[in-house]
Regions:
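Trp/Phe/Arg-rich N-terminal binding region typifying the photolyase-homology
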Residues: 1-165
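Substrate/cofactor-recognition hotspot
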Residues: 164-176
Length: 176
């Protein structure tokens, strides 16, 4: 029996979710995990928290909505607050997870989290692209040749790229 863990971060939905699809393709059991980072409640160098009350309320409503939709499909959302790499690694070990999936992030803090998690995990971490309309591999040019002006980018992309259809919402989520 293969168990996967899907680490949710900025992708609190079930539709058009590439890491979820990859996890479903490779698992008999699935853990959906969201970790609310403690660091978000600390002040930045500018003296304000990374998350304000309005954003936190919206995030919690989004998580509740995700929990409801996961339960309707037989899944369960695990919610924790703390250090995400520590929590994900601990859950992966406790539940004997074979692989962890997540969306690839590009911001420096999130990249550090990914590196930290990789060091802690005893299983592979599979990061999937999918937070943008196009994957890097679908571009008609290399990133080195990325047009500096948006209209040039748009013209090349419109001419040469076929936009993928969204991934449908899974009908069933495996239990954990």
């Amino acid at each position: 029996m293969r168990t996967t863990l899907l680490w949710l971060r900025n992708d609190l939905l079930l539709h058009d979710h590439w890491p979820l699809q990859c996890a479903l393709d490779k698992s008999d059991q699935l853990l959906l995990v969201y970790c609310l980072p403690d660091i978000w409640f600390q002040s930045t160098t500018y003296g304000f928290p990374k998350i304000n009350n309005i954003r936190l309320e919206f995030l919690l409503q989004s998580l509740e909505d995700l929990r409801k939709h996961a339960q309707e499909r037989g899944g369960e959302l695990i919610f924790r607050r703390g250090n995400p790499p520590e929590i994900v690694a601990e859950l992966a070990e406790r539940h004997r997870v074979d692989v962890v999936f997540a969306h690839r992030e590009h911001a420096p803090d999130e990249k550090r989290e990914e590196d930290n998690l990789r060091k802690r995990l005893k299983v592979p971490l599979r990061l999937c692209d999918g937070n943008s309309l196009l994957k890097e591999t679908e571009l008609p040019f290399s990133l080195v040749d990325l047009p500096q002006v948006f209209s040039n980018f748009r013209k090349q992309v419109e001419k040469e790229v076929q936009i993928s259809r969204p991934i449908p919402v899974p009908k069933i989520l495996p239990p954990h």
